[in-house]
Amino acid sequence: MQMEQILEQLLRGESLEFGSARATLERILSGEVPALAVALRAKGETADELAGFAAAMRAAAVRVAAPADRPVLDTCGTGGDGTGTFNISTVVAFVVAAAGVTVAKHGNRSISSRSGSADVLEALGFRIDLPPAAMERCLAEAGFAFLFAPALHPALKVVQPVRRELKIRTIFNLLGPLANPAGAPYQLIGAPSREAAAKMAQALAQLGTRRAYVVHGEDGLDEVSITGATHAYEVSEDGLRYEKLTPERFGLTAHPLEALRGGEAAENAAIARRILEGEAGAPRDVVLANAATALVVAEVVRTLREGVERAAQAIDSGAALAQMEKSAALTRTLG
């Protein structure tokens, strides 16, 4: 099928099947980038399209070998949710790693927000431009590695200028969390809407993910929220399951969204360090909620409250701060 025909099909509101979606993205990655992203945005992406596109992205990615003898998790959101919070999932990654889960965090620089995960990690002293072999050493030796998307998805260089020019969320925002180059079998993914969360969960199920939670806060957060309810879609070998998470489920107090605001990378790095040094307050609580969910996903704990206890112990013992510092130091020796 010609690309013009695909565009016409999408603009008529007709969806692509899995095979057509995969073939389409393979052509995009080889250099054909018309207004496809805009057409998909206007129509609304389906789970089949997401799964097909993600399969093509995974096949084209540079692979990073993850340790086979331990659980490996990714904490990744679609980013740019417009809420202006600090880099929650990045801090969560250190807490979860300190609690015994190897974290292969897939991420990028900011495209529409003030600070992406790559930006805040650099502000915390990380080298992010590591080759795949160095990333593998970070996973094996430190239990944490940052998988810098541009280095591992080189074919996406053809769409990056389009994303920056459009300055709107497109299907590529949704695809990043679905295409972890280390093939992390456990995932905690943040979505930009409840509808997107449901579709991303369906796509993960098609792609054979072992276990994942795809979450969206009613306040707009692409994280587990502590301002109110969070819509959560669980993917497991038993299929898909929806549940609503609230701060009370974690044994935590609700906080206003304003208490979670961040800023540029340097400010967000300072917030991250204060949390890991044990400072109490809303930023710590939202990290505890997300870390607890991640620990449930990785099958380290059974309940959210048990997860909060494990996460709090990782912070209060100094293990999470040590995890961050050890991981950063290793990247500097390898870079």
Identify the residue ranges that each predicted region occupies.
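Active-site-proximal loop->helix
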Residues: 109-126
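Glycine-rich anion-binding loops and their surrounding alpha/beta cores
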Residues: 9, 56-62, 85, 100, ...
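Short amphipathic alpha-helical face segments that pack within enzyme cores
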Residues: 35, 91-95, 290-293
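N-terminal glycine-rich anion-binding loops that anchor highly charged ligand groups
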Residues: 1-3, 10-51, 58-67, 286-287
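Short, small-residue-enriched loops and turns at beta-alpha junctions
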Residues: 14, 41-44, 79-83, 110-112, ...
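Short beta-strand segments at enzyme active-site cores
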Residues: 35, 103-106, 214
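Active-site cofactor/substrate anionic-group-binding motifs, chiefly glycine-
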Residues: 44-111
